[in-house]
Amino acid sequence: MNIFNQLKQDIIAASQKLYNNKEIANTATIETPKDSFNGDLSSNIAMIIASKESIAPREVALKFKEVLVTLPYIASIEIAGPGFINFTIKAESWQAAIKDILQHEEKFFEIDIDKNSNINIEYVSANPTGPMHIGHARGAVYGDVLARILQKVGYSVTKEYYVNDAGSQINDLVSTVLLRYKEALGEPITIPVGLYPGEYLIPLGEILSKEYGNKLLTMNDVERFKIIKSFAVEKMLDLNRKDLADLGIKHDVFFSEQSLYDKGEIEKTVKLLERMGLIYEGTLPAPKGKVHEDWEYRVQKLFKSTNYGDSQDRPIEKADGSWSYFASDLAYAKDKIDRGANHLIYVLGADHSGYVKRIEAIVKALGQEKVKVDVKICQLVNFVENGVPIKMSKRLGSFASVQDVNKEVGKDIIRFMMLTRQNDKPLDFDLVKVKEQSRENPIFYVQYAHVRTKSILSKARELMPEAYNSFKEGKYNLSLLSSEEEIEIIKLLAAWTKTLEASVKYFEPHRIAFYLINLASKFHSMWNFGKENSDYRFIIENNKELTLARLALASVIQKIIASGLEVIGVEPMVTM
């Protein structure tokens, strides 16, 4: 029995019985109270019903108590505060969760949520101008893990990378590669400020010199630019794909911004919005802090993004008459929707936090309020080595690339550590600490718990083969798992699917890392108790029955740690 799911179903049934309304109960929460004095589980259903029915919350809570207290898995119910209903669950019901996980693993891990959305999640989308720096790794891991979680629970998900191959930085890339090409032909060069001085572009110049000789120098500017751009962008994308693949990340679609221009998609989108009455000619107010006299008021085409919650309408043309970046964003969103997506998720860096409202406006307008949109911001990573910050700049030619850090610590450490803080909070990544074998290193602590649980099972097979075979046959008495420490671990194990569900509901994959760290901590505490008191050991050679029960506990801990690590794309370690 999944206690969380069962209690939710029983609350829904009680809501139908008492108030003829089971739909409202779907909005109620079931949480684990921070203070154990408030029971094992708590629900806000009484306050939700009270608000709708104009009844005192405690009165509603008392009615729910009368109905629910008779349930066979409930030990007691208390009403707290303004109307929270706090449940204490019988120990045998928690213990039964262990049996359910071992005997009905796939069913236990199922999550009952609406899965009708066709989700397009765009993440990374770094400019293809060089090796991917570690600053992009956080958004890459966050987006990839979120996509994995959504897929695990049954959503249709497209993982997409938007290739910014139509902007000024691409022009700078082409100019730099042209200089490296000339250098390969023997011409002395100087890389001007503003271009890309990194040595990673030298091989591109050498390849072009071998393929074209000096022919590119005699071509007209337009033809030469086109050849170098196509070549350089593809090479940089290959580099980025490899960097991502080395992190365990693979996108389904790489979508070219330039293709929107080449296929006339921007013009088509603008005409559509004109027919919808959402494009007009007008002027924009001076930006905040700009002196009025210094601001040039110019009549231009604007999109009515304020109709959809944006702070101001957005220009779709630049001063020279070319399309603005916003115009290509409009066409790109339309393309996603035309491909069948009805829920768009954008994962952006901290430097794009000002884009949230305008992106929401784009999707609301083009989706005609029928397409969901979520914009998630990943804050900066403070990347240090021995306490010294590492500068990250492609233009300076000195930066810590994803490849550099991957070689130093490995993909699993990068993936896990990028989830050790909520995505919208800054993250400190210390290269020294992540390689330590101590409880201060969360990835080591979790992996060590997995290794230890595996070793418990291996040791039992070696020392107590008869008992081990009985365990494999399901012959264990789980009521023996009755100590406070064991019950606390079991409660946490039973909350695994609840954690996964919350990660999906709130788009917060860090909850999984936090859960694994918490589970590892409780397991290691019990392991250490066993060093001081033999009664707490997992294998007690003169107590077969208790050993059987604890083998079941160790097995479930191992399965859930492995499941959690696999969800976030980290390989569970077997030995250390």
Swiss-Prot record:
Gene Ontology cellular-component terms listed: cytoplasm
Protein name as annotated: Arginine--tRNA ligase
SUPFAM superfamilies in the record: Anticodon-binding domain of a subclass of class I aminoacyl-tRNA synthetases, Arginyl-tRNA synthetase (ArgRS), N-terminal 'additional' domain, Nucleotidylyl transferase
Cell compartment(s), UniProt: Cytoplasm
InterPro entries: aa-tRNA-synth_I_CS, Arg-tRNA-ligase, Arg-tRNA-synth_N, Arg-tRNA-synth_N_sf, ArgRS_core, DALR_anticod-bd, Rossmann-like_a/b/a_fold, tRNAsynth_Ia_anticodon-bd
Top-level lineage group: Bacteria
GO biological process terms on file: arginyl-tRNA aminoacylation
Originating gene: argS
Residue positions of motif 'HIGH' region: 126-136
